[in-house]
């Protein structure tokens, strides 16, 4: 009987993209490690919903900018489940601020979670995967607009731009240690638009796609599953953006 597959999904405690990805993996038969930073009650609610699907679930707190905390989280997941087959890095910070008001602290905040947190989780989980004969799959989450940033997010977009470099670098590093470890990234377009956006801004985001609609967390979950299914894909940073990357509306 093959070993039970285990997925660690960061940022899956809150009802956002991470929890939808966790749901999709649970429906695929994965045991799921739900990560959260401070939202313990929401993480337990997410875990309860996954258990109702028949999945084995654990909740694991960690500040992803803290190397010791990430090491401890990965160690705890391995201690609970015995292995990690999939890591999906969904945890993110996204704050709008005009350039004149951006401080070094703002930049550090975004890089700590979006770049450093992604790296540390992929490093630690990836090295664990490299020690498994079956390897494993890491899926990071960047942002389509790293190539065409827009106003108001000067601290955010650079931190997400780092995710593509991290993805390609760790695809090379981990494959060198075990060719069965693959690392890819998803670059979402307008999915779960921030509530602080005005209706005009939301409509503009939709007009900027070729499909003329907002994406859903389910679209991101589908992309994650496609990376799991195709074992000849690694080092790829895939826009899931309704054509936003290639379209320049007037």
Residues covered by each model-derived region:
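Canonical Rossmann dinucleotide-binding motif of NAD(H)/NADP(H)-dependent dehydrogenases/reductases
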Residues: 2-33
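The beta1-alpha1 cofactor-binding region of Rossmann-like NAD(H)/NADP(H)-dependent oxidoreductases
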Residues: 40, 61-73, 104, 218-219
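Conserved NAD(P)H cofactor-binding loop of Rossmann-fold oxidoreductase domains
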Residues: 90-95, 243
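Substrate-binding pocket helix/loop in short-chain dehydrogenase/reductase
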Residues: 98-99, 106-108, 205
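Active-site helix of classical SDR
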Residues: 122, 159, 167
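Alpha-helical segment proximal to the catalytic Tyr-Lys
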Residues: 127, 172-176
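C-terminal substrate-recognition "lid" of short-chain dehydrogenase/reductases
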Residues: 216-240, 245
């Amino acid at each position: 009987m093959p070993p039970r597959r285990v997925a660690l999904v960061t940022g899956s405690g809150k009802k956002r993209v991470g929890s939808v990805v966790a749901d999709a993996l649970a429906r695929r038969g994965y045991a799921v490690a739900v990560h959260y930073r401070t939202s313990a009650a929401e993480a337990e609610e997410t875990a309860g919903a996954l258990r109702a699907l028949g999945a084995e679930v654990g909740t694991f707190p960690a500040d992803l900018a803290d190397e010791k905390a990430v090491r401890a989280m990965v160690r705890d997941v391995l201690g609970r489940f015995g292995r990690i087959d999939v890591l999906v890095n969904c945890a993110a910070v996204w704050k709008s601020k005009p350039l004149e008001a951006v401080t070094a602290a703002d930049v550090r905040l975004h890089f700590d979670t979006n770049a450093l947190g992604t790296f540390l989780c992929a490093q630690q989980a990836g090295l664990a995967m490299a020690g498994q004969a079956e390897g494993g799959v890491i899926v990071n989450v960047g942002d389509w607009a790293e190539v065409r940033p827009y106003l108001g997010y000067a601290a955010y977009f650079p931190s997400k731009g780092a995710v593509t470099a991290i993805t390609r670098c760790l695809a090379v590093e981990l494959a060198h240690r075990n060719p069965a470890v693959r690392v890819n990234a998803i670059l979402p377009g307008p999915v779960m638009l921030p509530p602080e956006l005005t209706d005009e801004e939301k409509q503009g985001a939709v007009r900027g796609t070729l499909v003329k609609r907002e994406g859903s967390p389910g679209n991101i979950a589908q992309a994650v599953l496609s990376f799991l299914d195709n074992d000849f894909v690694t080092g790829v940073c895939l826009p899931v953006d309704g054509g936003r990357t290639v379209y320049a509306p007037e």
